[in-house]
A protein has these predicted regions:
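Mature-chain termini and adjacent capping regions
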Residues: 1-169
C-alpha cells in the first residue's frame, strides 16, 4: 500500500515533462508545486486528480487549470503516464532559454509521455511575444520538435509573425 502511494505521488512529477523541451534548462530541476481546492488519489486505477483552481509552478513554468488528471498505466511493462488538463481555458507560461516568454491556452491539454505528444484542443493558442498561432487543435511532437495546427473545417488556422522577432539574437 505504501509503495503504491509513493508510486502514485511520483505521477505529479511527470506533469511538467511536456514543457521541459521549451523551458529554461534549470526549470526541470526546480521543485514542482501544485495547489488546488481538491485533490484525490485512486490507488486501484493509478489516477491522481487535482480539481478546482489548480495552479502548478516549477521554475519559470506556470500552469492554471480547472482540473488536471494524471494516469499511470497499471502494468509495470514500461508504459508511460498520460496527463489531461481541462479549463476555461487551461493556460500556461514559461521563459525559454533565450529569455523570451511563451504563453499558451486551450480548453483541453493532453500529454502522452510515451509518444511525447502534446495536444492543445479547443481555441488553442501559442504565443511568443507578439507572434502567435491560433487553431482548433495544435499538436506538438516534443521529440521531433514539430508542430501541426489545424481547424475542423470551420475557420482557418491563423498565424501572426513579426519578422524582427524571428531573427536570432
Amino acid at each position: 500500500m505504501k509503495l503504491k502511494i509513493i508510486k502514485s505521488l511520483t505521477l505529479i512529477g511527470t506533469l511538467l515533462f511536456s514543457f521541459s523541451a521549451l523551458a529554461l534548462k534549470n526549470d526541470t530541476q526546480q521543485p514542482i508545486n501544485i495547489t488546488s481546492d481538491n485533490q484525490s488519489l485512486d490507488l486501484e486505477n493509478n489516477i491522481v486528480t487535482f480539481s478546482d483552481n489548480v495552479v502548478i509552478t516549477q521554475g519559470s513554468i506556470l500552469i492554471n487549470a480547472d482540473k488536471v488528471t494524471i494516469i499511470r498505466p497499471a502494468d509495470n511493462g514500461g508504459g508511460k503516464e498520460k496527463i489531461e488538463a481541462l479549463g476555461n481555458p487551461v493556460t500556461f507560461q514559461q521563459e525559454l532559454d533565450n529569455g523570451k516568454p511563451i504563453n499558451g491556452k486551450a480548453s483541453k491539454v493532453n500529454y502522452d509521455l510515451g509518444s511525447e505528444y502534446l495536444i492543445l484542443t479547443g481555441n488553442a493558442q501559442l504565443k511568443q511575444l507578439d507572434s502567435q498561432i491560433d487553431a482548433e487543435v495544435i499538436t506538438y511532437d516534443v521529440k521531433q520538435q514539430k508542430m501541426i495546427a489545424k481547424n475542423s473545417g470551420k475557420g482557418r488556422v491563423k498565424t501572426i509573425l513579426y519578422p524582427s522577432q524571428l531573427q536570432q539574437k
